[in-house]
C-alpha cells in the first residue's frame, strides 16, 4: 500500500483510507468513475437515507437518537469533481489520534498495534504530532509540522474540540 501504517494507528490512511464501490446504474451514469472527496464510514448511513429519501431518525422505539455524524455522498454521484463537504473527521484508537480538516491531516502515534499496551486512551501534552497536506501528499509521507507550527497547533485544538464534543476522551 502507499501508506506506512495500519488500522489501529488512527490518523494513518493505511487503516482509514479504503476503496469503496457503489453500483447504482439508474443514478450514477458515469461507470468506473473515481471520487477523491474525503469521506468516512460514518457517511454511509446518511448516504443511504438520502438516496431512499428518508429522514434521519430522531426516535427509535421510544429512545431519542443522538444526531448522526457524517455527510451524504450523494452529491458526488452526479458530480465527480464536486467540492468536498465532509471537511472534518477525528480519529482515536488506543490513544493514537488524528484529525482531518479541510485537506490537512494531523496525527500522533503513541503506541503501535504490535507493541504491548502501555498507554491506553491517554492524552499527553508531549505526544509528538505530525502534519500533512493531503491535497499534495496522498500517502502522508512529508511531515510539515516544523514548517507550519501554527497550523499544527490549530489542528490539535480542533482534535480536542471534536473529541470533547463527541465524548471520545
Please describe what each predicted stretch is.
Residues 1-13, 27-37, 41-130, 134, ...:
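C-terminal cap/loop subdomain of S1 sulfatases and analogous C-terminal strand-loop tails that border
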Residues 161-163:
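Type III/flagellar export substrates
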Residues 153:
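Substrate-binding clefts and catalytic carboxylate motifs of secreted carbohydrate-active enzymes
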Residues 17-20, 41:
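Active-site neighborhoods of enzymes that stabilize oxyanions during catalysis
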Residues 22-25:
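Conserved nucleotide-sugar donor-binding
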